[in-house]
Swiss-Prot record:
Cofactors named for this entry: Mg(2+)
E.C. code: 2.7.8.7
Residues binding Mg(2+), per UniProt: 8, 57
One GO cellular component term noted in the UniProt record for this chain: cytoplasm
Gene name of the encoded protein: acpS
GO biological process terms, semicolon-separated: fatty acid biosynthetic process
The protein's role, per its UniProt record: Transfers the 4'-phosphopantetheine moiety from coenzyme A to a Ser of acyl-carrier-protein.
Catalytic reaction(s) noted: apo-[ACP] + CoA = holo-[ACP] + adenosine 3',5'-bisphosphate + H(+)
Protein name: Holo-[acyl-carrier-protein] synthase
């Protein structure tokens, strides 16, 4: 069953301006070390950061909290599955909120779609609760 859906559209130029103006102060506040390493390896850093920014916003919406109620930017990390598909690793307040959304006897699966077509980056996050067969 679907327990949360979120989407976000991010202007890549806005992220580019934040990178130019605030540099590491911006990236360290919003992104995990792993996300920074992946984005900083790219020739075009801004689209990579913008996709991740949009994913975090979409995730916060899917959790039903936005960036409040103990959910912080770095509680949500865009990572890749072995297949290369993006997903999110949640910690802290985001993980606690996810646990509260998922009914007993179920486990969460996060579906993430990321894209960019300059000047925009977009993300969709769907939180699915699957029956846990081990219960």
């Amino acid at each position: 069953m679907i327990v949360g859906i979120g989407s976000d559209l991010c202007d890549i130029r806005r992220i580019e301006r934040s990178l130019e103006r605030f540099g590491e102060r911006f990236t360290q506040r919003v992104f995990t070390p792993g996300e920074r390493a992946r984005s900083d390896r790219r020739a075009a850093r801004a689209p990579s950061y913008a996709r991740r920014f949009a994913a975090k916003e979409a995730c916060a919406k899917a959790l039903g909290t936005g960036l409040s109620q103990g959910v912080f930017w770095r509680d949500m990390e865009v990572v890749n599955l072995p297949s290369g598909a993006p997903t999110l690793r949640l910690t802290g307040g985001a993980a606690a909120r996810l646990a509260a959304l998922v009914p007993p006897g179920h486990r969460a699966r996060l579906h993430v779609s990321l894209t960019d077509d300059p000047p925009l980056a977009q993300a969709f996050v769907v939180i699915e609760a699957l029956r846990d067969e081990s219960c």
